[in-house]
Amino acid sequence: MDLTLSRADYLQVGVTSQKTMKLLPTSRQRATQKVVVGDQDGVVICFGVKKGEAVPVFKTLPGQKISRLELGGAVNTPQEKIFIAAGSEIRGFTKRGKQFLSFETNLTESIKAMYISGSDLFLSASYIYNHYCDCKDQNYYLSGDKINDVICLPVEKLSRVTPVLACQDRVLRVLQGSDVMYEIEVPGPPTVLALHNGDGGDSGEGLLFGTSDGRLGLIQITTSKPIHKWEIRNDKKRGGILCVDSFDIMGDGVKDLLVGRDDGMVEVYSFENANEPVLRFDQMLSESVTSIQGGCVGKDGYDEIVLATYSGWVTGLTTEPTHKESGPGEELKLNQEMQNKISSLRSEIEHLQFKVLQERENYQQSSQSSQAKSTVPSFSINDKFTLNKEDASYSLVLEVRTAIDNVLIQSDVPIDLLDVDKNSAVVSFSSCDTESNDNFLLATYRCQANTTRLELKIRSIEGQYGTLQAYVTPRIQPKTCQVRQYHIKPLSLHQRTHFIDHDRPMNTLTLTGQFSFAEVHSWVVFCLPEVPEKPPAGECATFYFQNTFLDTQLECVYRKGEGVFKSDNISTISILKDVLSKEATKRKINLNISYEINEVSVKHTLKLIHPKLEYQLLLAKKVQLIDALKELQVHEGNTDFLTPEYRCILEEADHLQEEYKKQPAHLERLYGMITDLFIDKFKFKGTNVKTKVPMLLEILDSYDQNTLISFFDAA
């Protein structure tokens, strides 16, 4: 990495949504550009930068929340008309701020994504896609899952209109008119789409995608099939991708890839050998990066990466050096511009301090008045609750515009809180009376000063379902709190996948009865994550899932009056049977339940658990030895007398302890899964084997795979 960029904060607007900031084009190369940004207060602000200060060009009045901002204009001309999506309306402004368009789309849902190409307007709400030409309806498509972004391949290069939808079910849908031409499976839920090199590359068919689990890829969209070019995995476990741009920030004549993530990470990838991108620069900001674009804003001749963050900061990472070299014997003098900026900042700070003092006094006086009424200050929370495939844990991210004081986590189901490296908050646990009020967890995170983003990790137990609640209290007066609820589902560790291995030994659960397609779909939504709330189009639905903890799989096929569920894990079938029959009983629906149990599947599941259990037992054994080995080392003065295996444990002691600490109750969790498997195997035979559980735990304590399998067979 040989790119050095300096940070400059230009302006703070209201809270911003994804892709709501753009740079207006200029006629001269590397001349300063104007920035236009829309916020959730409905305000559009256009400004330039002179002598390091933001100078407004225009500012609109507040209105509905702005969900997208795009630039448009006639094809092959500078794209300098500003279009915003707010609610179900599209408004257009000139670069001077004059409104020239107000188009009410009459969509029943608010617009979530927008793309403009010449006179073509592509919009998507949660599930609905619409294509307009000159504000006249052209095409329409109803998606089976939520649409996160929409784009169109460049018409000027391909002479055809090819829209692409990024859908939550890990699929890119390539459209032709109102029909799907073909679907492209991607490794995670796609959150953002962008044209490769800003124009689709040489062919015009290059499409970049970013996913919510932090992966990045390039696909060539041909007329007949997709061609996967490359994909960058998220090995460093960074945040999900919110924005992507192409710009030559390295100055080598080849456009680089600029990436903004929801954990505040900004990355620059360059194409050294023109094949796969190489990371050349990264910098961590303290909050989500909602928009990113390369250009020139601060000073003529100096390229920079311009960002908008969740709390509304418009920031530049510029190539302009902050320090100027001085010759030998010369003193480095601050230029007049820098001195002016410092004095301006000082006076601004003094003014703000005086204003804060004044407002505090006013508040103090009014709060003591008998007539005064206190109003609760409103604040928005940007939250995300997602399942991580790598470690089978849920990541809960809470982001507030102002500093967070504390977050109280309450759960009515047993969950484990895992360590997060980025989390500097101090956590304290309160004892829970689980019998009286179903409280299994009460934990308070007290945040350090100026923390606006908090990330937590939890691991749930399948079969135990309920609600996790987060009470978020920011540092504002009067003290106020917002509650966010997250559902822990019965099969919470299952994740959607595109295909499963049909050769595995499968157990089958079949439900029949007088229930509608919508009813059985609502039961599947209740049991499993990542299932769209609306029933899919057609008479039958098929979903595939993989258990992120054990790698077992589940197939759900259902229609009106029938549901068939297949899994290589008996415990999954047992959980589904219990939960679905309970849900049907609530609605007074008679269910006919039948099942086919494959005995081979039990041995198969135990073999899947084996490497994980063996690894955890070995890790626990090594951690237990560390203190004794350290004592021996101190006593003997060296480690030469130890075997290579013990020396290795001492060398890796910190790493082993850290890993063990990160996975609390991991071993107990595996023991629990084997115990459930044992009980469930015999439950389907009508036998209660709970009295044999202590014997099973004894076998697990002196674990041997063959002995365990024999015990399962003999019981």
Swiss-Prot record:
Annotated GO molecular function terms are: RNA polymerase II-specific DNA-binding transcription factor binding
Protein's recorded name:
BBSome complex member BBS7
Q: Which domain of life is it from?
A: Eukaryota
Give the sites modified to N-acetylmethionine: M1
Cellular localisation: Cell projection, Cilium membrane; Cytoplasm; Cytoplasm, Cytoskeleton, Microtubule organizing center, Centrosome, Centriolar satellite; Cytoplasm, Cytoskeleton, Cilium basal body
UniProt keyword annotations, A-Z: Acetylation, Cell membrane, Cell projection, Cilium, Cilium biogenesis/degradation, Cytoplasm, Cytoskeleton, Membrane, Protein transport, Transport
UniProt lineage: Eukaryota, Metazoa, Chordata, Craniata, Vertebrata
Task: Report which residue ranges the record marks as coiled coil.
Answer: none
Pfam families under this entry?
BBS7_GAE, BBS7_hp, BBS7_pf, Beta-prop_BBS7
Any one cellular-component term (Gene Ontology): axoneme
Q: Which PANTHER family match?
A: BARDET-BIEDL SYNDROME 7 PROTEIN
Q: How does it assemble?
A: Part of BBSome complex, that contains BBS1, BBS2, BBS4, BBS5, BBS7, BBS8/TTC8, BBS9 and BBIP10. Interacts with BBS2 (via C-terminus). Interacts with CCDC28B. Interacts with SMO; the interaction is indicative for the association of SMO with the BBsome complex to facilitate ciliary localization of SMO.
Q: What does this protein do?
A: The BBSome complex is thought to function as a coat complex required for sorting of specific membrane proteins to the primary cilia. The BBSome complex is required for ciliogenesis but is dispensable for centriolar satellite function. This ciliogenic function is mediated in part by the Rab8 GDP/GTP exchange factor, which localizes to the basal body and contacts the BBSome. Rab8(GTP) enters the primary cilium and promotes extension of the ciliary membrane.
Tell me yes or no: is Cell membrane among this UniProt entry's keywords: yes
